[in-house]
Amino acid sequence: MAGTSSAKTRFALLPGHDEEICMPSDAPAWSLHSQLKKDTIDIGDLPLCRVLVIKDANFPWLLLVPRRNEAVEIIDLDEVEQAQLMTEISRVARALKEVTRCDKLNIAALGNLVPQLHLHVIARRSSDVAWPRPVWGVMPALAHDAEEVQNFISALRRKIWLG
């Protein structure tokens, strides 16, 4: 039914998946929260999430942000989107672990300061400055070396999108 809120636009999932993610065709354009925009570098889009690198060289730190304006909590996504989110978390976390050869992955959805749903995927090493504590507030953000961060992003893109 064209023109009604029940009209849907279909987005294909990751290759090999038969399910689809639907979003109302009259949904407003998605936008990234201004704080996340300021603090990150865009890597690219998966079917549901934008993948970003946090601008802090202290830790290999990624964000996944579902492209749903209304989502503040994971429970704000429908069941198909929640399943897709888990698929994308796994794919990105696996890539991060392979690229960094980290000891541990920290995965969290906090959102106390930024109300847009986003998930942190952080590679941790027992030798990092915050180990074993959480990374928040331990050290001031350290700017990335431009060449190093581009190499990191290229390696992540190969692992995430090419496997």
Predicted regions and their residues:
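A cross-taxon signal for low-complexity, glycine/charged-rich
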Residues: M1-G3, A7, G16-D18
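HIT superfamily nucleotide-processing domains
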Residues: I21-G163
